[in-house]
């Protein structure tokens, strides 16, 4: 076997986590910043404000659909490659990379076509009709964001594959380059040219194009798993195994889309019944605020997922090499780190909610906006420690090849409990019921995750003895 990946089975676990997890965290944080930076600049543009923020909230789940497909391909290929290399099957690893590229390109083109053809229907499904001004901004933003979907998906899919090739730093740099360009262009297009939602979208897409170009360059210069021309021919067994390994990443994202769709529509419905938010000039506030809360949640989850996803090559290699003691040590360290991230986030939202809100243009908004935002932060994120631990379990189980358990946990959290509570609780508690839906869903999910954690620990101990 090519020796450059052998250190995954011998190097100290803590050092490996730093090498692989930190670049992955930065990459995911930077990826999350694409949409978050847009929302910050939009919110602080007085001619867009909460209407633009609400539009961003409407479109955001649709970018997550693209991300879901991309990470299914990328994370699945990453796990496939890592396990193959651990078993000294380099040829199989190269074949999976070629197949991943083709599947990503085809699926991105299909998704772009669907978005362009059914734009009005899709926006209405995600709450875009809260009022006329929000809908107008949503249409404009969505059109230009859709044009960048193929570039976005390719860049996101290649990121974990580049890490699996032993280049986590390049994966980080490629994502960082696009995000930095987005940050530079956003104020130019929004405040300088006054392009509004179009400007925010064009800045984002430009950054995505840069990331995709860097990913193409790396694909042509891979160190270990560079595919040959014949490896791009689709093979059913390779695609099936790869997508099976990545299905948890897909479902964890796509189920989040289902939850966001339910939340957006319940906000639109019960906001219209509220004494304040039922007025046309304030109707967009709940949608805008919940979008801000979700963006903060996304930042935290990006750190959590980055830690876990960065460990996929380490887990895959050591599972393939039958070094279960190292896998167990990694699992223990990962859970402790994830809980720590959740604790820090909880302190921030409970003590400094107004400072967090201020980033998103609160100075330009009414007192109704600020008060609802403070309440939303404290309610929606009150169980964020459990959410962090749950996410870690989903991805770790996936890395160990236990796609069934991981998929079940992910679906139960977002769809069964998340959507269920989002549809049920507002009947009794109005808008507050919508906010409580996600934290409440983390409690039963954690109990299920705890059972699987204990079961996994025992299986690792048995395989080691």
Listing of model-derived features with the role each one plays in the protein:
Residues 1-21, 81-148, 192-247, 315-383, ...:
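Short alpha-helical transmembrane segments in multi-pass integral membrane proteins
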Residues 19-38, 144, 178, 207-211, ...:
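Transmembrane helical elements of multi-pass membrane transporters/channels
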Residues 29, 33-54, 123-132, 188-195, ...:
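Helix-terminus/linker motif at the lipid-water interface of multi-pass membrane proteins
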């Amino acid at each position: 076997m090519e020796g450059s990946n052998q250190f995954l089975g011998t190097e100290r676990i803590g050092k490996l986590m730093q090498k692989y997890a930190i670049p992955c965290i930065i990459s995911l944080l930077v990826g999350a910043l694409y949409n978050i930076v847009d929302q910050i600049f939009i919110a602080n543009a007085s001619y867009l404000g909460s209407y633009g923020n609400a539009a961003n909230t409407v479109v955001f789940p649709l970018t997550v659909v693209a991300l879901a497909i991309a990470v299914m391909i990328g994370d699945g290929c990453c796990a496939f490659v890592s396990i193959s290399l651990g078993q000294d099957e380099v040829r199989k690893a190269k074949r999976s990379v070629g197949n991943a590229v083709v599947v990503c390109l085809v699926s991105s083109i299909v998704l772009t076509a669907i978005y362009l053809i059914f734009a009005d229907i899709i926006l209405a499904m995600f709450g875009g009709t809260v009022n006329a001004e929000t809908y107008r901004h949503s249409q404009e933003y969505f059109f230009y964001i859709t044009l960048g979907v193929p570039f976005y998906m390719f860049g996101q899919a290649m990121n974990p594959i580049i890490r699996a090739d032993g280049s986590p730093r390049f994966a980080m740099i490629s994502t960082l380059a696009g995000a930095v360009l987005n940050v530079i262009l956003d104020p130019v297009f929004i405040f300088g040219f006054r392009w509004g939602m179009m400007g925010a979208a064009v800045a984002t897409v430009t950054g995505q194009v840069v990331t995709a170009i860097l990913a193409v360059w790396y694909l042509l210069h891979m160190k270990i798993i560079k595919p040959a021309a014949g490896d791009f021919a689709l093979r059913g067994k390779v695609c099936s195994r790869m997508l099976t390994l990545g299905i948890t990443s897909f479902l964890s994202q796509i189920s989040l889309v289902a939850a966001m769709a339910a939340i957006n529509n319940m906000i639109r419905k019960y906001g219209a019944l509220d004494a304040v938010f039922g007025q046309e000039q304030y109707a967009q506030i709940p949608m805008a605020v919940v979008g801000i809360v979700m963006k903060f949640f996304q930042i935290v989850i990006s750190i959590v997922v980055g830690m876990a996803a960065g460990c996929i090559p380490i887990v895959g290699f050591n599972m393939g090499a039958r070094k279960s003691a190292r896998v167990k040590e990694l699992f223990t360290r990962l859970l402790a780190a994830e809980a720590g991230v959740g604790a820090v986030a909880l302190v921030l939202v409970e003590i400094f909610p107004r400072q967090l809100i201020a980033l998103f243009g609160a100075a330009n908004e009414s007192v109704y906006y600020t008060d609802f935002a403070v309440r939303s932060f404290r309610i929606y994120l009150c169980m964020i420690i459990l959410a962090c631990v749950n996410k870690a379990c989903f991805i770790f189980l996936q890395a160990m090849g236990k796609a069934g358990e991981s998929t079940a946990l992910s679906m139960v959290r977002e769809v069964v409990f998340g959507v269920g509570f989002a549809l049920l609780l507002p009947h009794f508690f109005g808008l507050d019921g919508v906010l409580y839906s996600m934290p409440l869903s983390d409690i039963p999910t954690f109990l299920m995750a705890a059972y699987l954690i204990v079961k996994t620990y025992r299986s690792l101990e048995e395989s080691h003895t």
